[in-house]
């Protein structure tokens, strides 16, 4: 699961419950170098659909999955 994203340096990043790496955000993927979307709880404890796959959008939709 992910917390709602916070602002860091103008970009939104969401920290996972386990606190390891970024959960959401452009170019950051759940501690696995992805885009921060689509990784399940088996990959660091983050939920699916943690953020939208748009690096330029303002809607990361980091919530509780």
UniProtKB/Swiss-Prot annotation:
Task: Spell out the Pfam families in the cross-references.
Answer: KRTAP (PF11759)
Which key words tag this protein in UniProt? Keratin, Repeat
Membrane-spanning ranges:
none
Has the keyword Isomerase been applied to this entry? no
GO cellular component terms, A-Z: cytosol; intermediate filament
Tell me, in a sentence or two, what this protein's role is: In the hair cortex, hair keratin intermediate filaments are embedded in an interfilamentous matrix, consisting of hair keratin-associated proteins (KRTAP), which are essential for the formation of a rigid and resistant hair shaft through their extensive disulfide bond cross-linking with abundant cysteine residues of hair keratins. The matrix proteins include the high-sulfur and high-glycine-tyrosine keratins.
Q: Which family does it belong to?
A: Belongs to the KRTAP type 20 family.
**Subunit organization:** Interacts with hair keratins.
Protein name as it appears in the record: Keratin-associated protein 20-2
Q: Which organism is it from?
A: Homo sapiens
Give the organism's phylogenetic lineage: Eukaryota, Metazoa, Chordata, Craniata, Vertebrata
């Amino acid at each position: 699961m992910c917390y709602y994203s916070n602002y860091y340096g103008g970009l939104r990043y969401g920290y996972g419950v386990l606190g390891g790496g970024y959960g959401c955000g452009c170019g950051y993927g759940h501690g696995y170098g992805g885009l921060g979307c689509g990784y399940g709880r088996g990959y660091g404890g983050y939920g699916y659909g943690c953020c939208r796959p748009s690096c330029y959008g303002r809607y990361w939709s980091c919530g509780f999955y």
